[in-house]
Each structure stands twice: as structure tokens, then as C-alpha cells.
């Protein structure tokens, strides 16, 4: 007989310092903050303002905008002017530190990506560095990053250091590999400079589309910060989680696994849908753990039986049952447990068994149906990602066991989908590139031909096996 260990459900926040984003405090002395990212063209000021208002009215507390260049930065300045009184805005900057310098003068927060802030765009090549060359690169990083820190100090601008698994620099990859340790070091390089420069107004994120890698890396970052006496607030999210029920369950597994241990000061549920659709999901996850009146503390029991986590709930809403079961079980399934058993008298057995499989797939333990990785899209995406996902799903849904990525652009696309079997990546207006794992096999083909070409590629590979 398998021993049963009942789990005591409690919630204790990890202590973190405070970051001030406009008038919004982020850190362990404040509620977990909810945020989203606009998917409009930042230069379309009317559409961007309208979408941001919808998001704030839906309950988000921050809205992030893609900020590719100086034109987008000036557009964001006008968007900021039109949204006075709604909430803080965040500029999302990749590849161009000069844009970050400018944006830091206009909005309450700037996000930079260590993988492409000073290092050149990733080309997936191993580059050998001597110790002297590596240190020279770190000194270059220090000099350039210090300039941004000084601007942020002058304008009371918060900074998010946001590492993505899909966009680690070739420099980091060459020394640490495609590993959680590499992601953590990519972040710590910047944190050490900030601490040396006495800049504390920082929030960190360290994300991946793989829930197991995401959770492991965040925990490793917390441990490394503790070793170096740093306690910055953390933003949580699963990149490219997808859409619909699968996207929600995957986000819940990843984010919930950390919230369950009190890790996380702000969250975003990244869905390939309208950004305002993300907010109720994020709120539900936050409230499940942080609200003492939540059903978690009055109608849920969790137990461990061998390699199985057992989750019993009185939840009467199916959408909430999906989120809460995935969030609660995520911690255990991304740890030592390999199976899940759900019990709820309000729902039939078939529904519960399917949810069990969906949660196991989100945790990377099985793949019983086609898995889709898709980004939430942003102003860099030049096609309607929701329509494309539906088209790709309709064409490939019968291909059980495959993992297919649909990515809006090249910022995270090739990297985040590296463990996908095939990838559909935006390459320009009306143009798509198709990937087999990391290899680009068809470049800049017309969008209207892309799904058929993807199917043909899969067919050829299947026939050649």
C-alpha cells in the first residue's frame, strides 16, 4: 500500500526589496502586481492608447509596449501623455541601448534583455573567448549599462532586467551552454553592475517557454541572489505559453509552481490572444495563492502518494478548476512527482482524466497530443497571430507527439522554439521562415504559402525516417 502524505497549504512571500514604478510599489510588502503587454503597433498611437485603456480597465497595473527605435520611443512618449492617471507604462527594448536611454526619460520603467543589450544578435555559433577577452566584454557591458543606470537615477525610472531562454547571447552560450546556469549568470552580470552603482530600482524576470526550465531557473536565480545578498523583486511568466485552455494550463503550471512557495512579486500570463484576456487569468492565479479566503484554504486538499500528487477540490467552475489544479500541482510535477490524480465531485471522470493529461503535458512529462508554442505577439509581429495559430492547428492537430512553434518575430523565435520540432516564424511583412528545430530550412516565403510548406516539410521528414 502506497503511503499518503497530506500537504499543509500555506503561503509565505519571499522577502524582496521594493521597486517603485511611477506610483506603483513592487515587492514583498505590496500585493502581487498584474501586468500585460500591448500587441499594437506602437506607432499607431490611437490603437495603442485604446488598447492600454482596455487593459487598465480590466485590472492590469502595468502595460508594456515594444520600443524598437527612436520613432517608437517618441510614439510611446505621446501614448504616455494620453494615459496620465491610468497607470505606469514600460518600454520593451531589444538590440539598441540608445533606445533604452531615450525611453528611460519618457516612461516609468524600461525593460532590457541582457542577451542583446550590448552583445551582438545571436547567430547560434560557438565563439571561443579567452579569459581576457571575456573580461573585456564584461567591461564593455559595465560601461554601457552604467550610462543607462545614471539616466534612470536622474528620471526616477525603474528598470527590468529580463532574461529570455530564447535570446541568450552567443557569449553566454559559449561559456555556460543553453542552461539555467547560463540564464542566471546573464542576469547576475547586470545585477552586479547595478549594485556597484548603487541602483536598486530593479525588477527581474528570467523566462522560458518550457515550464521545467523556467521554474528551475527562477529558483536558481533566487539562490544565487541570496548568496550575493541581493533580494530584488521577481516578475514571473511562461513565454510563448500559447492560447486557449492549453496556454492557460501551461502558464498556471509554471507560475503556480513558484507562487506556491511565495516566489513572485508581479506576474503576466502570456497568451496568444488580446492582452486584456490575460488579466483575469493572472488575477485568478494571484488570488488563489495570496487571498486567505481563497478556495485553496477552504475547499482543497493536496497529498503525495508515491510518485503521484493528489488534488481534491470543491471548485464548481471548470475554468477555475483547470487553473487551480494546474497551479497547485505544478510545484510537485516540476519536482519529483510524475503523475497527478484529480478529484472533484462536480465534474465527470472523463473531464478530470483529460485535465490530468493536459497538466502532465504542460509539465513536460508526457506529450499525448500536438503541442503548440506560440508567443503572445507584440508590436514587432507583422501578422495576425491568432488567425495563424488557428490555421496551423487545423492543419497539424492530427500530428500527435509533435511540438510546433508559431512565433511573431526573431527576437525570441529561433531560441525559444529550439526544442520544438518545427517552427513558423515571422520574417517581415507577409514573409515567413520555417524551421526544423534550430535550422532555418525555408526563408522568407510568402505567408499564404507557409502552412502548406510546413505540412510538406513534415511529410518529407516523416517519409525520410
Outline where the language-model segments fall.
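N-terminal amphipathic alpha-helix/helix-capping segment at the start of soluble metabolic enzymes
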Residues: 1-37, 149-155, 291-305, 390, ...
Amino acid at each position: 500500500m502506497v503511503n499518503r502524505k497530506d500537504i499543509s497549504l500555506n503561503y509565505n512571500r519571499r522577502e524582496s526589496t521594493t521597486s517603485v514604478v511611477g506610483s506603483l510599489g513592487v515587492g514583498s510588502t505590496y500585493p502581487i502586481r498584474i501586468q500585460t503587454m500591448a500587441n499594437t503597433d506602437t506607432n499607431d498611437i490611437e490603437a495603442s492608447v485604446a488598447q492600454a485603456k482596455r487593459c487598465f480597465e480590466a485590472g492590469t497595473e502595468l502595460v508594456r509596449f515594444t520600443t524598437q527605435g527612436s520613432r517608437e520611443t517618441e510614439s510611446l512618449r505621446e501614448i504616455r501623455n494620453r494615459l496620465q492617471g491610468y497607470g505606469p507604462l514600460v518600454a520593451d527594448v531589444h538590440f539598441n541601448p540608445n533606445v533604452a536611454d531615450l525611453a528611460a526619460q519618457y516612461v516609468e520603467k524600461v525593460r532590457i534583455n541582457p542577451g542583446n543589450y550590448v552583445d551582438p544578435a545571436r547567430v547560434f555559433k560557438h565563439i571561443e573567448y579567452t579569459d581576457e577577452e571575456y573580461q573585456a566584454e564584461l567591461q564593455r557591458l559595465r560601461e554601457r549599462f552604467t550610462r543607462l543606470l545614471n539616466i534612470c537615477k536622474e528620471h526616477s525610472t525603474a528598470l527590468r532586467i529580463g532574461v529570455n531562454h530564447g535570446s541568450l547571447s552567443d557569449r553566454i552560450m559559449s561559456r555556460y551552454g543553453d542552461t539555467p546556469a547560463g540564464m542566471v549568470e546573464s542576469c547576475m552580470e547586470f545585477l552586479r553592475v547595478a549594485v556597484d552603482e548603487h541602483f536598486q530600482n530593479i525588477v527581474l524576470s528570467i523566462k522560458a517557454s518550457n515550464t521545467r526550465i523556467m521554474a528551475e531557473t527562477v529558483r536558481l536565480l533566487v539562490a544565487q541572489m541570496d548568496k550575493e545578498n541581493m533580494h530584488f523583486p521577481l516578475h514571473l511568466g511562461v513565454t510563448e505559453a500559447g492560447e486557449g485552455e492549453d496556454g492557460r494550463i501551461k502558464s498556471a503550471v509554471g507560475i503556480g509552481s513558484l507562487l506556491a512557495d511565495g516566489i513572485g512579486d508581479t506576474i503576466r500570463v502570456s497568451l496568444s490572444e488580446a492582452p486584456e484576456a490575460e488579466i483575469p487569468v493572472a488575477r485568478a492565479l494571484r488570488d488563489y495563492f495570496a487571498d486567505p479566503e481563497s478556495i485553496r484554504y477552504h475547499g482543497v486538499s493536496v497529498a503525495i502518494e508515491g510518485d503521484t500528487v493528489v488534488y481534491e477540490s470543491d471548485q464548481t467552475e471548470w475554468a477555475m478548476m483547470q487553473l487551480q489544479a494546474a497551479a497547485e500541482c505544478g510545484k510537485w510535477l516540476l519536482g519529483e512527482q510524475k503523475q497527478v490524480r484529480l478529484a472533484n465531485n462536480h465534474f465527470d471522470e472523463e473531464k478530470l482524466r483529460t485535465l490530468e493529461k493536459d497538466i502532465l503535458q504542460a509539465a513536460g512529462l508526457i506529450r499525448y497530443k500536438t503541442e503548440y508554442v506560440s508567443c503572445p505577439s507584440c508590436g514587432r509581429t507583422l501578422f495576425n497571430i491568432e488567425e495563424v495559430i488557428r490555421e496551423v492547428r487545423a492543419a497539424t492537430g492530427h500530428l500527435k507527439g509533435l511540438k510546433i512553434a508559431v512565433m511573431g518575430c526573431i527576437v525570441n523565435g529561433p531560441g525559444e522554439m529550439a526544442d520544438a520540432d518545427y517552427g513558423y516564424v515571422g520574417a517581415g511583412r507577409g514573409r515567413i521562415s520555417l524551421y526544423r528545430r534550430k535550422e532555418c530550412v525555408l526563408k522568407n516565403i510568402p505567408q499564404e504559402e507557409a502552412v502548406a510548406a510546413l505540412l510538406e516539410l513534415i511529410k518529407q521528414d516523416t517519409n525520410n525516417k
